[in-house]
Design a protein with these regions (language model features):
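Positively charged n-region of N-terminal signal peptides that target proteins for export
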Residues: 1-4
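Cyclophilin-like peptidyl-prolyl cis-trans isomerases
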Residues: 6-12, 19-179
Length: 179
């Protein structure tokens, strides 16, 4: 009888937790970044940068990133995108974001917000680290990480700007079809 009570108690606690928003939001925090080079899955890190994650979701919902080129791709460093003008000088119509620096290191596959010299100037541009770039730690906002498809990021044409730039086909939330 004691075992039955223990099992009942265990399942009455675990089952509701597994249906809680925390578990649901894990699915919501994965985005599909469809590039001209292939599909990349990214995990948004709202535990590190909630305002930046909110902005990325907002812009993705508006299809802001669709067909935007990678305008700055430095071999052994990073691939930058998110500027609708393709020059590195543009952004969205939304106000710039305050920095959300964290101790999270910039490693291969880390995604950070690009900005000007002013720490609170991030808007829509972001970069994906092609290699570790720990010299950026605590100077740029980490808001996501590549969890699948890094080979497609590696295949992005290099240059500032590249002669034939690769681009974002679309950015969207992951759904069950993406599993």
């Amino acid at each position: 009888m004691r075992n039955i009570i223990c099992l009942f108690t265990f399942f009455s606690i675990i089952l509701p937790l597994s249906l809680s928003p925390a578990f649901a939001s894990e699915k919501e925090s994965v985005m599909i970044l469809e590039l001209s080079t292939g599909i990349v899955k990214i995990r948004l890190r709202d535990d590190l940068a909630p305002k930046h994650v909110e902005r990325m979701k907002q812009l993705a919902d508006l299809k802001f990133y669709d067909n935007i080129i990678f305008h700055r791709v430095i071999d052994g460093f990073m691939a930058q995108t998110g500027d609708p003008t393709g020059t590195g000088m543009g952004g969205s119509d939304y106000p710039d974001l305050r920095a959300e620096f964290s101790p999270e290191p910039f490693l291969r596959g880390t995604i950070g917000m690009a900005r000007s010299r002013h720490p609170d100037s991030a808007n829509s541009q972001f970069f994906i680290c092609l290699e570790d770039a720990e010299f950026l730690n605590r100077q740029y906002t980490v808001f996501a990480e590549v969890i699948e498809g890094m080979e497609h990021v590696d295949a992005i044409a290099k240059g500032e700007p590249p002669e034939k730039p690769d681009y974002i086909v679309t950015m969207r939330p992951a759904d069950t079809d993406d599993e």
